Structure formats: C-alpha cells, structure tokens
Regions:
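Low-complexity, acidic/polar, glycine-enriched regions of mature
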Residues: 24-196
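N-terminal signal peptide c-region/cleavage motif recognized by signal peptidases
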Residues: 20-22
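Bacterial N-terminal signal peptides that target proteins for export
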Residues: 2-12
Length: 196
C-alpha cells in the first residue's frame, strides 16, 4: 500500500515538473548592449528647423517568451548623457528648464511586447520622465535575432519609434513648444545579448 501511494506521488510530481518546466524555460532573458543602444529623438525648433538628439548611456533588460508570444522591456536612460552634438546645447538640455538631470538623472521605460505571428511588433509601456509617468506606445519596424559572431550567444536587435509631447511631462522648456509644436518623435535603436 505504501509503495502504491509513493508511486502515485512520484507520478504526480513528475507530471507537475513536466508541465511547469517548459513554461519556465521558455522565457529568454536579454541584457541591453549599451554600446549598441541609443534612444534618439527629434522635435521642431520654433517651426523653422528640426533638432535631433540622443542619449549615449542606456541599460536594461528584455524578456521574450516565444512559446507564449509575450515579452517585457525595462529600459533605464541616463539623462546626463544627452548628446545634441553641440556642447552648449547639451549643457542647456541638462538644466532645470529641460531634463533637470541634477534632480532626475534617469528616465525609465517599462513595457509589454505584443507579438504578431512569431515576432514582436509593438510595445505598450509607461515612460517616466521628470518624475511623471505617461503611456507611450512603440512600433517595432525591425526585430531580428542572430547568433553573435564574437560572443557566441544570441543577440536581438530592434528599431523602434513612437511619439510623446514635452508638455505632458512638465518640462519647463515645453512652454516654447505647446500643442503640436511640443511633439517629439522617438527613434530607438537597441541590441540585447541573451543571458545564460
């Protein structure tokens, strides 16, 4: 009788492990490659030209569950690394009127990947800038994974874009660009290396 009960318990445990194991193993984790990831943006300058800038330091992680067709993204942007290609502009952008990096040295994005077929096509997320969080949707124009020739691991890359408005985040500079003039177009190149 005891042997029979023990046998049933072992079978039950094996079934639970077989069911839970693949679901847990299906989620792959990727670390952002900071040397290949640059959130960039562009916006109208008084309606007569377009200014473009980027952030040079970014970290974070991405998870992908291909079996379930889901994933997540968590990105941390070092706002002190703002780069317009012009020192005076960079200095102004770090000031209280713009990104106020002394008080808010980072901006964050946390989102959920939506798959169409075998690949993620959009990210529905929350972007926090200057302590204010607003929804931002990103469209993935490119998403591809390949074996990395140097690291011998899978690396995934994407090109994403979306839109936001300075004024929604309380940026003081936005007083010069309210309404449509405050619109900012995001272009984000990202690469992430699979973790063991």
């Amino acid at each position: 009788m005891q042997h029979r009960m023990l046998g049933k318990k072992l079978i039950h445990a094996a079934l639970v492990a077989a069911t839970a194991g693949p679901a847990f193993a299906a989620a792959d984790r990727y670390e952002i490659e900071p040397n290949h990831t640059y959130p960039s943006f562009e916006f109208s300058h008084m309606g007569i030209s377009v200014w473009r800038g980027k952030f040079d330091r970014t970290s974070g992680r991405i998870t992908i569950d291909r079996a379930a067709g889901t994933g997540t993204a968590e990105i941390v942007i070092d706002t002190t690394s703002i780069d317009f290609g012009l020192d005076k502009m960079d200095e102004a952008a770090r000031s209280e009127d713009w990104f106020n990096v002394a008080k808010f040295p980072t901006a964050t994005y946390k989102g959920t990947l939506t798959f169409v077929g075998d690949f993620p096509r959009t990210v529905e997320g929350q972007f926090t800038l200057l302590g204010i969080t607003r929804p931002v949707k990103l469209t993935l124009n490119i998403f591809k994974c390949i074996p990395h020739p140097m690291f011998k691991k899978e690396v995934c890359g994407a090109d994403a874009e979306g839109d936001l408005n300075w004024s929604e985040y309380g940026m003081k500079h936005s007083k010069y660009g309210e309404g449509d003039a405050g619109r900012v177009h995001l272009r984000i190149q990202v690469e992430a290396l699979k973790q063991d």
